[in-house]
Amino acid sequence: MFAPIIAIDAMGGDFGPHCVVPASIAFLAENPSSQLILVGQPALLEELLSRHPSLDRQRLRVHAASEVIGSDERPSQALRGKPDASMRVALELVRDGCAQACVSAGNTGALMALSRHLLKTLPGIDRPAMVTAVPTEKGHCHLLDLGANVDCSAEHLYQFAVMGAVAAEALGCASPRVALLNVGVEEIKGNQQVKLAASLLQKAEGLNFAGYIEGDGLYRGEADVVVCDGFVGNILLKASEGLAAMVSARIEQRFRDGLAAKLVGALALPLLRRLRGDIAPARYNGASFLGLQGIVVKSHGSAAEEGFQSALRRAALEVRENLPQRLHGRLEHLLL
């Protein structure tokens, strides 16, 4: 059986190894063919791992790295300094063929800069894009870019659309519907970059371009891949996560107001828990860096154990599907 090997920046994120270690152990329990490499400070990692004496250490190894890239450090600092940072070392393991994917909850800008520097982009790709799954009425859609590219040309949006479509196909969506996020669905709507990107996508053979989509259409499941620049995508993603948390909290509060509400709440609790699970950010945690010659998945910095597990699952799936190679094989036929 194929055994994905994933290198983990164990020191990144708000909780560092205190989240990464238990999430890694839980991931290995549900994925018996996978192997993990925890990159970070050995003394701390070994102390946390020692609390799990039954753990199969053949499948979970520690790789030493003495430095950590802080959340407030600039990408340029990450590139020039800290050669022994856990994030950098984890990416070097992918570059050198010791691992097939890297997962980090650390500094997003630093992770993107180091990924581009160490792994390089696929031929024909100017900029990698961040993509993740977003829940919809019909399941989920793939949204990109999520913040890696704040300012985008029409050509960049076109490349994102092509990469998103190929990735969606590789992850099980046949002939994915691709749409550009816009302020309206009419052809006259949108800024110049979006209009030019639409013109390019209309001419692309082998791409199922569905035109423009508005924010509400995204959640109705009117497209399988939704493309926008990183400025819009990041705001949309954060607003969606905040809205989901607010709705969940409001519903819980209403069911605690009075005896009758509590009785109704008790009956509705299983359904509400299922609904919360369907839209929980932790379930969809893990944004992939598309367009690189290797697999990199960014976990939310504030993700807890369940969320980090989701990021590991996404990385393992992309390894099994050989995503960079599949992208490379299709991109040369679709890129301008």
UniProtKB/Swiss-Prot annotation:
Organism in which the protein naturally occurs: Pseudomonas paraeruginosa (strain DSM 24068 / PA7)
Cited Pfam families: FA_synthesis
Gene Ontology annotations of biological process type: fatty acid biosynthetic process; phospholipid biosynthetic process
Subunit structure: Homodimer. Probably interacts with PlsY.
Keywords: Cytoplasm, Lipid biosynthesis, Lipid metabolism, Phospholipid biosynthesis, Phospholipid metabolism, Transferase
Subcellular location per the Swiss-Prot or TrEMBL entry: Cytoplasm
Similarity field: Belongs to the PlsX family.
Transmembrane segments: none
Cellular component per GO, a single term: cytoplasm
Pathway the protein contributes to: Lipid metabolism; phospholipid metabolism
Protein name, as recorded: Phosphate acyltransferase
InterPro entries for the chain: FA_synthesis, Phospholipid_synth_PlsX-like
EC number: 2.3.1.274
MF (Gene Ontology): phosphate:acyl-[acyl carrier protein] acyltransferase activity
HAMAP family: PlsX (MF_00019)
